[in-house]
Every structure is written in C-alpha cells, then in structure tokens.
Curated annotation (Swiss-Prot):
GO BP annotations, alphabetical order: alanyl-tRNA aminoacylation
Organism: Pyrococcus abyssi (strain GE5 / Orsay)
Taxonomic superkingdom: Archaea
Entry function: Catalyzes the attachment of alanine to tRNA(Ala) in a two-step reaction: alanine is first activated by ATP to form Ala-AMP and then transferred to the acceptor end of tRNA(Ala). Also edits incorrectly charged Ser-tRNA(Ala) and Gly-tRNA(Ala) via its editing domain.
Subcellular compartments: Cytoplasm
Protein name per the record: Alanine--tRNA ligase
Stated family: Belongs to the class-II aminoacyl-tRNA synthetase family.
EC number: 6.1.1.7
Keywords, sorted A to Z: Aminoacyl-tRNA synthetase, ATP-binding, Cytoplasm, Ligase, Metal-binding, Nucleotide-binding, Protein biosynthesis, RNA-binding, tRNA-binding, Zinc
C-alpha cells in the first residue's frame, strides 16, 4: 500500500513531492532543483568538517534543548517523562529496550494503561545488537544510543495530534531551535512496520544524515478471520486498523550532536571522554583526519551490513585518500577498536546499573558478549588496563545526568572485574577444548571449522572466534569468521522462546461466563463460603464466587472440600482461565448448574502458603538491602514445608551475608510491620513505586494489585498475604544454591515449617552428641579432632599400601617367564585397581609385557618400548575371552573382566600371541 502523505505544512508552504532519481522513493523538499532524497547512498554526508548546525552541542545540551522545546511548547505542551530502565521489567517479550515506544508497549498502546502523560516527551537510552559488528567501523553505528521522542496516544474520541502537527513540530524544532537550513531538510516517505504494528512514516534527512523518524502507528497484524475490506498490505504483511492511533517518533541524540560538531565520526562527538584517554593509554599515533572522514562518508554511502565483508569499504577509502589498503588497515584499526570499546562499555554501564547480571542466558548473555568483546579489543590494542577502569570513566562523566550510576558504582565495577577474571579462566581451559574438537574434525577429513561450531564455542564456552582461529590455524585448520559474527549470536540470544501453557479448560467454554468473585481477596482469612454452580466442564466446575485460591504468582492452589446434597467432595486443583476460576473435583457427577454448594478450604495448607508468601516479600527486602539494588527476583515457589526465592546476583552469597539477611528479615517480623494491599491503575502504581513493582514478573491488566510491607517492600502481586509481618513467624534460611550463572536460589522456611527445621537440626545434634559422647557445644572441636586423627590414620594406610605394593612387585619379579625374546609376567593377584596400576608401572621394562588381574576382575597391562605389541589390543584380547571392557594407550591399559573364572585362560591367550 502506498501512502501519499500530503500534510498541511507541505501544502501551505510550497513543499514539492518528488521521486528520488537514485532509489525511486518519494520525498518532500522546498528545493525545486533537488533530485535526490537525501538518504545515503543517494546522497553522501555533507556535514563532516562542515557542521550542519551553527552551534556546537554536547549530549546534555542537545537532550535538554529537545526536552525543553516540547515540554514548554505554547500550543502542544508535552509532559516530560524520565527514562525507563534498559531492562524492560514491565514486559516479557523482549530482552532490552531498543526504542522509546517500547516503554509503552503493550499496556499503553493497547489502552490497558494510561500513558504517564499525553502527549509526552522522553529521551530513552536504547540498546540494539543488530549492528554490533559495525560499531567502531562505520563512524555512525552504536549498540547504545538515546532515542529522543515525542509521543501522542490518540484514543477513540480523545485525539491529541496526528500527522500534520507531528511534521510541523519536527520542522519547528530543527529550523527554529537548531537553526538548520529549511531547504536542506527532506521528508522521505517510507512506511514502517515492526513489533506487530505498522503505519505511514517519514524519515527526516539533513545533509545526508537521517536525524529523525516520524511514524504514525495505526495498524496492527491482521487476524486470520479479518474482513478483507479492512486489510491493508504493508511490506508484504497483512494489517488492520488499530483503535488507538499512536505518534511514534525517534530523534537521534548522538546523530544531532555529531551534526552540530561535524567531527570525523559520531564517536568523537559523543564519547571523547573515553576515546581520548584510550588513545593516550594505547599510544596510538595521530591519524590523518581525512582517513576517518572519508571512512565515515563512504561507510554511509552503502549498506555495509549487507556486504558481509569490510574489504570493499577498505579498498574504496584507500583509493580516495591515496594509500594502500595495508597502510589504511594499520592506521585505522586502533581507532576502530577504541571506538568500539567506548561504545560497548557505555552500553554495559547502563545495563549493569539497570540490573542486568552477566550470564549465559537472555540479557545476561548480551552483557557478557559486550564484556568479552571489549576485553578482546583491549588485547588487540596491547592494553593491559582493567575493563572496570574504562567503565569508571563513563560513570564519572554521566553520573550527573544519571545519578543511579554513582549509587551502583561499586557493584558495577565489581561485576566487571569478576567477569574479566572468569574470562581469563575460560581462555585457559578453552585451548585444550578447541584442540580436541580440531582432532575430531581432522578424523572426519574436514579442513575448516564450521560456523555452527564457532557459535557453540562462543555460546557454551565463551571462546571468541578470533581465539579459535588463532589456535586452529596453528593446527592447520581453516576458520572463516563472518564480519557479522557477533550480530548473528546476539540475534539468536534475542529470540525468545514462546512457551505455550496447556489450558486446563478451553477458554472458549468459559468466555461467556461472568468474572468469578474472588472472596480470597476480600477476606484472606475466610475458611468457608457458599456459592452457586455456574457450569460443569468434565472434572471441573465453575462457581459464581470462591475462597479457593487458584495457582499463580508462585503460590500453589488451595485444596479442600465442597459440600453438595449432603456429600463431601474433594477439591484437588484450582486454576484461572481468563477471568474465570475453575475447580477440579473428585466426583463431578454430583454437580448440576444452578446448585448451591458450601466450600471449605484446607486452612493449614493455606495459612502456611500465606506465611511463606509474605515471608518471601520480607526476605526480598532484606536481600536488596544486604546485597545491593542490582538484586531482582528471578522466580519463586511456595510449599507448606519450605519456599524458594531465586534472585539475580553475580557471585555466591557468603555465610556472613546470609546471617545478616536472616537477621534483618527476622527483625522485620518481630517489628510486626503492617502488610497492606490495594488495587491501583498501572500507570499510577508505576509512577508511585517505580518498576521495582515487577519483582515477581509481569502482571497483566489495567489495574494491578499492589502489596506493600510498611517501609520495607512494594510489589505487584496477586497472592494471599498476612495483615502483618509478625504473623509470618520465624524465618530460617535452610541453604543456598547456584542454579545457573547469575542466579542464586535461597531455600527457606517460615513459621511452623521453620520450627520443624530447627527441631530436626536439634535432633541431629543430639544424635551426634550421643555417638561421640560429648555435649552439643563440644561437637565442633571433637569433630575436628576426629577428622585430624582420621587424616593421620589415612596417611599410615597409604604408607602400608605402598609397602604391600613393593612386596607384590618383589614377588612378581620372581615369576618372570621368558617367551621368545620377551619377558612376560601374567598373574592373578590381590589388590585394588590402584594397586594393579602401580604394580604394572613398577614392573615395566623395555622388553617386558605385564598382565595383572585381581580376584575382583580388575586388570592392568603394561607393554615395554621394545615390544611390538599394543596394550590396548591386549586389553581387547583379555575381554574377548573373559567379557567386560577396558582400554588405554599403546603402553598402558586397564579395565575389568566379567568372568574371573576365565582370567587364567585369558592370560594364557596373550602368551600364545607372543
């Protein structure tokens, strides 16, 4: 579908719609002589060395200029909104925020939540890995950038502004605020589609650089049964109109600063505070600025992402500046590495400050990718500076604008140092792994490591393709590393697996029923209730109201009984399907629609779930205070006997930290703080409490239930809770586990369950005291004494074993047989596998074969250097007669036979071989 986007401004001010003579796309211009759209490769950069904005701006100045312009606009004042975290806790379908509109998906766009302001203006740090392999090379690509944006949400019957006003606001900002020349600005028509939405759009171009995109989101992906008269085709996909029309703009902060400074690259304009120190540290020679300028200009002229190779760019730049490709490579490579390090470490600063913990999964994997890529670049530069020192430069520069960086500085730098140490250890282990894999490939007759194997080396073992290539080429194996290797692995990491939960009851069978009244929220202490049966579906029944809690949010379902016509029927499972709660019963045949029933929940089970659920919130508050603000809940589960809480944390929790966490949690219990809950509109809850609300994960709905422990913890939570912390009872941490890289699991118990655990421990201590015949307080020193005595006894046993081995060798030396030109010892002896191994090694001589078999069936074989036989083959001969298995090297083999009665026959078969 082609949108002809004639706006009010275009008509009134004499703009001309033309078709670009290079790409054929339509664009609007004030210049009657213009023939090209202004978008590379149709036009090259015209601002490098000649800034396109009269005043030079810093990042902070340009950001404030933009925000203030829209905030104070006379006709369309916008509400200024603070940046959102780059880790989007409010949604679970993406790993990182890659655009400002993602802050408001899905809840605001769908109409389920109100925007924080309407219209609004924001400058949102955004992270994208699609161009990671081009960062540092092209002069313009970043993994992290700020998308300045103004958004308007036009709900049905509540219009704010649309295409005309958006274009006018953009033009006003560029020409009146930034003093750009109107005749050099073009608006290129280019429909946009992404994330299931689409609409007409303008790319705003100035002197060869795209400085903004204005998207008018008004379509959503069409369902299969959509009426054909409503369907539009955009970029090959089917869409239907949305109820809410959204103005989705994006202005490149870094690009506008670059435009104002006209520096050779965008990195020089916005990352100088890291670039310059790195140049000094690396002792990089000053480069002819023409090289960087031409590199940026030419990189902008073609889509390097589609080339898959840098050779063409290098060749063109070298020709332009009159040097060889080799000279260009030598001059420009250190700069490219420095630019990439500066960008990657800035992205890391935002990611770690917002709670990303490096790991091998999800956003943690992407953080680790940046860390290891940066370390590799430092190594190539010959710099031995800790990566944390470079990250510290970002914190120092940016903390005034982003004060959270200073608050998190110690944690951020410690994480970086730990990751650098881990990577060093990985590289030491990795070399052997690569060589083993190369040996396997050679056996298969392969001469090159395939891409899939390179990806596995990186994803599973942290081995960069550059390191693999270095090792492989020494072994005579080729390695081709694609220029976009890191983009490939990042893309794979960003693919979220869609896990479809199996529905217990088909939604279609209950969608016409009214929402179930939730008595467990109205009175969490309600033990019995009356209700009416609305529907029977197989083993499941639907009631008009219920006190049975359905499974959800880490809290198991309630069980209990329903009384119907004098019968008591067990309720074995409770689930929620849409807004309807369904109960699984043992005898569904007793229930009929319209019947009145009485329910009774298993109170002992419920109250223990409530203790553990409220205890989870208490413990979470203690964890954040002891370990740091980077800690986020990564999962939880409750039972009646214990609960578990998974948290993001970059190292094991120490015993000292655990004691402090447990002490703090129990202090909050003893203080008997109030626990309250209320239903709040999503946007109001977020503005009041921040995104810490989503500790337990994404909570759907326009209105969300917020559970608050007085001055301690606030979470959006659908579980049942106690009215005060005192009712939780004692909290006992049972143990911690490292369930995956970057995630710690705390298993704990509350109330009666905690008391039972203490009683168990007391019983264990009592039994240990009885066995050792000492009081409990003497157990540690007694255990230590026994352990030391055991170690001494073990040493004596080892000495005796060695003496016995010497004796065995002495006896066996007397039993040497002469078989042709060889010496042969073949005996059935007493001893363990270790004894046999030591004996054959001691008996080994250049002209001798030794075969020893124990009465348990273990065997060991040694073959001297001058013997033309293979120990591995002899092991196979032995097991071919007596069964079992074994193997080894040419000179030594071991194993175990199945039939010891055939040991003598098997040994004699080896004599015959000689």
């Amino acid at each position: 579908m082609e949108f002809i986007m004639k706006t009010r401004m275009f008509e009134e001010e004499g703009w001309i719609r033309k078709k670009c003579k290079v790409c054929g796309k339509p664009f609007w211009t004030l210049d009657p002589d213009r023939e090209t759209c202004g978008d590379p490769p149709c036009d090259e950069y015209q601002f490098i060395g000649k800034p396109g904005i009269p005043k030079k701006y810093t990042l902070d100045e340009m950001r404030e200029k933009f925000l203030k312009f829209f905030e104070k606009h006379e006709v369309y004042p916008h509400g200024r909104v603070k940046r959102y975290p780059v880790l989007p806790r409010w949604r679970d379908d993406v790993l990182l925020v890659g655009a400002s509109i993602m802050d408001f998906q899905p809840w605001v766009i769908s109409g389920e939540a109100d925007p924080p302001a309407n219209p609004l203006v924001i400058s949102q740090p955004s992270i994208r890995f699609t161009d990671i392999d081009n960062v540092g090379i092209t002069g313009r690509h970043f993994t992290i950038f700020e998308m300045m944006a103004h958004h308007a949400f036009n709900y049905p019957g509540k219009p704010i502004y649309w295409i005309d006003e958006t274009v006018e606001l953009a033009f006003e900002f560029f020409t009146k605020e930034l003093k750009m020349k109107p005749e050099d600005i073009t608006f290129k028509e280019n429909p946009w589609a992404g994330g299931g939405n689409a609409g007409p759009a303008f790319e705003v171009l100035y002197r060869g650089l795209e400085v903004a995109t204005l998207v008018f989101m008004q379509y959503k992906k069409a369902p299969e049964n959509a009426p054909e008269d409503q369907v539009v085709i955009i970029k090959g996909d089917r869409y239907v109109p949305m109820e809410t029309k959204v103005v989705d703009t994006g202005y490149g902060l870094e690009r506008l600063v670059w435009m104002s400074q006209g520096t050779p690259t965008a990195y020089d304009a916005v990352l100088g505070y890291v670039v310059e120190p790195l140049k000094r540290m690396a002792g990089v020679e000053k480069i002819d600025e023409r090289i960087l300028m031409e590199n940026s200009r030419l990189a902008g002229m073609f889509d390097i992402e589609d080339m898959g190779d840098l050779k063409l760019l290098r060749k063109k730049v070298a020709e332009k500046v009159g040097i060889s490709v080799e000279e260009l490579e030598k001059a420009i490579r250190p700069y490219e590495l420095i630019y990439a390090i500066a960008d990657h470490t800035k992205a890391l600063t935002f990611m770690l400050a917002d709670g990303v913990i490096p790991s091998n999964v999800k956003a943690g994997y992407l953080a680790r990718l940046l860390i290891r890529k940066s370390i590799r670049h430092l190594k190539e530069l010959g710099l031995e500076v800790p990566l944390s020192e470079i990250v510290a430069l970002h914190i120092k520069e940016l903390h005034k604008t982003f004060p959270e960086f200073k608050e998190m500085e110690d944690v951020i730098l410690e994480i970086i140092d730990l990751e650098e140490k881990k990577y060093s250890e990985t590289l030491k282990r990795g070399s052997d792994l690569v060589r083993r894999e190369i040996a396997k490939l050679k056996k298969k007759g392969m001469s090159e490591i395939p891409l899939e194997k390179l990806i596995t080396f990186y994803e599973s073992h942290g081995l960069t393709p550059e390191l693999v290539k270095e090792i492989a080429e020494k072994e005579g194996i080729k390695v081709h590393v694609p220029d976009n290797f890191y983009s490939i692995v990042a893309k794979e990491a960003e693919k979220e697996k869609e896990e479809k939960e199996e529905e217990v009851v088909d939604f279609e069978l209950v969608k016409d029923l009214p929402e179930t009244r939730t008595l467990y929220y109205e009175d969490p202490f309600m033990k019995e209730f009356e209700a009416r049966v609305l529907r029977v579906i197989g083993d499941w029944i639907v009631l008009d109201q219920t006190a049975f809690y359905p499974e959800g949010g880490g809290q198991p379902y309630d069980t209990g009984v329903l009384f119907v016509n004098g019968s008591e029927v067990k309720v074995t499972n409770v689930q929620k399907v849409g807004k309807v709660i369904v109960h699984k019963v043992e005898n569904p045949g007793l229930f009929k629609e319209g019947m009145e029933v009485r329910g009774r929940i298993d109170w002992d089970r419920r109250i223990q779930h409530m203790r553990h659920h409220t205890g989870t919130h208490v413990l979470m508050g203690a964890l954040v205070r002891v370990l740091g603000k980077h800690v986020w809940q990564a999962g939880s589960q409750l039972t009646t006997d214990w609960a578990r809480l998974d948290i993001s944390h970059y190292k094991r929790i120490s015993d000292e930290e655990l004691r402090e966490i447990e002490r703090l949690a129990n202090r909050i219990v003893m203080e008997d703080r109030k626990v309250t809950w209320e239903w709040l509109p999503r946007t109001e809850a977020e503005q009041r409490y921040g995104f810490r609300l989503y500790q337990g994960g994404v909570v759907p709905g326009r209105v969300i239930r917020v559970v608050k422990i007085e001055d301690w913890d606030v979470q959006a939570c659908g579980g049942t809770h106690l009215p005060s912390t005192g009712l939780v009872g004692p909290i006992k941490i049972l143990r911690t586990e490292r369930i995956q890289d970057g995630v710690e699991r705390i298993i704990f118990a509350c109330g009666e369950a905690a008391i039972k655990e203490w009683q168990k421990e007391r019983e264990i201590l009592k039994k240990a005291s009885q066995v050792l015949r000492v009081p409990p307080e003497k157990l540690p020193e007694t255990a230590e004494r026994f352990f030391n005595e055991w170690k001494e006894a073990r040493k004596e046993v080892e000495k005796l074993k060695k003496e016995l081995a010497k004796l065995l060798v002495y006896e066996l030396e007397a039993k040497v047989q002469k078989v042709k030109e060889y010496e042969f010892i073949g005996e059935i002896v007493e001893g363990s596998m270790d004894d046999l191994r030591e004996a054959v090694e001691r008996l080994k001589k250049p002209n001798r074969i030794v075969v020893l078999v124990s009465k348990e069936g273990y065997f060991a074989i040694s073959v001297g250097d001058n013997v033309n036989l293979n120990a591995n083959d002899l092991a196979k001969k032995l097991t071919s007669i007596a069964g079992g298995g074994g193997g080894g090297r040419k000179d030594v083999a071991q194993g175990r036979i199945k039939d010891v009665s055939k040991a003598k026959e098997a040994i004699e078969s080896i004599v015959k071989l000689l």
